[in-house]
């Protein structure tokens, strides 16, 4: 039962978020062989001024060994 959480800055349209959720769902279904009913996708908007604390330090820096795609920036770039 994959549940994918996408954290992003505010400002993307509902259409863009829906399109991304559909693309993620399609890829999860194809690659991991789950049915559509098993996949859920959430979008969490985080303000740019909160990104370092709420996302980078909490979900990236402190979980570096769990990232399958690492960012090309660090906390000093924020």
Feature locations, PLM:
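A domain-level signal for the structural core that forms small-molecule/cofactor-binding pockets
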Residues: 2-78
């Amino acid at each position: 039962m994959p549940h994918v959480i996408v954290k992003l800055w505010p400002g993307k349209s509902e259409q863009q978020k829906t399109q991304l959720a559909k693309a993620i769902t399609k890829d999860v279904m194809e690659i991991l062989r789950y049915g559509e009913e098993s996949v859920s996708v959430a979008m969490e908007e985080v303000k740019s001024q909160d990104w370092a604390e709420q996302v980078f330090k909490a979900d990236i820096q402190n979980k570096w060994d769990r990232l399958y795609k690492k960012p090309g920036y660090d906390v000093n770039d924020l």
